Amino acid sequence: MEDEEVAESWEEAADSGEIDRRLEKKLKITQKESRKSKSPPKVPIVIQDDSLPAGPPPQIRILKRPTSNGVVSSPNSTSRPTLPVKSLAQREAEYAEARKRILGSASPEEEQEKPILDRPTRISQPEDSRQPNNVIRQPLGPDGSQGFKQRR
């Protein structure tokens, strides 16, 4: 490849026959390599004969996982201890205690009884001092024309 001429374009290379020579050269190299590599396959191929009986299928055993003390537990026993059932009063007491710890109040009713002072209250005006609701607008167009009132 040191003495090779490089054509200006592929059209010049095709006209001069340079592309054909390079292709033939590469084809010869690949044919030589393929002849060398036609040795027998390195992995043996096992062909099973259907006339011979097949061996027994492999047995699968499911093993039990031992518990922490090394004894295998039976499938019917549960490894978790049963929790005592709490009454409604006990659950409400625990809830109130947790709510007091987190929110600072024991019951949700206390929150609802307090008026919310963050929002301003709406001051109602007497009926006669209110503005009339029937506002008539007469829009103008972008160039100062009559807008929607203009007839075409």
Curated annotation (Swiss-Prot):
Q: Where is this region: Disordered?
A: 30-152
Q: Quick check: keyword Metal-binding in the entry? A: no
Which Pfam families does the record match to this protein? SUZ, SUZ-C
N-acetylmethionine modified-residue sites: 1
Q: Keywords, A to Z?
A: Acetylation, Phosphoprotein
Domain SUZ residue range list: 42-107
Q: Which InterPro entries match?
A: SUZ (IPR024771), SUZ-C (IPR024642), SZRD1 (IPR039228)
Residues of the SUZ-C domain: 111-152
Presence of keyword Glycoprotein: no
In-chain residues carrying the UniProt-annotated modification Phosphoserine: 37, 39, 51, 105, 107
- Cite the record's Polar residues compositional bias ranges: 66-81
The residue ranges flagged as biased composition, category Basic and acidic residues, are: 89-100, 113-130
Task: Supply the PANTHER family for this chain.
Answer: SUZ DOMAIN-CONTAINING PROTEIN 1
Family indicated by similarity: Belongs to the SZRD1 family.
Q: What is this protein called?
A: SUZ RNA-binding domain-containing
